[in-house]
Amino acid sequence: MFKHNEQQPEGFQISLKEALDNLAFNDAGLVAAIAQQHDSGEVLMMAWMNREAIEETLATGRVCYFSRSRGKLWRKGESSGQVQTLKELRIDCDGDALLVKVDQTGSACHTGRRDCFYWKADANNVTIDKAPIKDPKELYGK
């Protein structure tokens, strides 16, 4: 459906139901979702969403993912307070990935770092190049 409509003019619309019906969810019913800070373009994290998480996110404006480890919906910030407020949700041209533009409160990463991409690779090494902005023990009480 997405490829079929890629030559449509700007302003062309389909229903949310049709778009969700045609997303390329994987065998587990999930689609990759990249969270990006809406005003700076900073890439914060990658997580997974199922249809229910997408629908809840769009309905509430608070970003909800699907936790593979817990096997349930994960409302970002429900235990840490580090909430993501939805600014815009975009679907890529193949319908197999989402870009979730957010306003991130505090850190996005469970390590207490602003984002999850703190390992920087070059031809010889991989180096941690970002410090936590908050102690994870303070975020999660562990």
From Swiss-Prot:
Binds 1 Mg(2+) ion per subunit. Binds 1 zinc ion per subunit. Mg(2+) binds at D92, D94, D96. InterPro entries: PRA-CH, PRib_AMP_CycHydrolase_dom, PRib_AMP_CycHydrolase_sf. Its cofactor is Mg(2+); Zn(2+). Keywords: Amino-acid biosynthesis, Cytoplasm, Histidine biosynthesis, Hydrolase, Magnesium, Metal-binding, Zinc. Gene3D superfamilies: Phosphoribosyl-AMP cyclohydrolase. It is an enzyme of class 3 (hydrolase). SUPFAM superfamilies: HisI-like. It is found in: Cytoplasm. Homodimer. Belongs to the PRA-CH family. This is Phosphoribosyl-AMP cyclohydrolase.
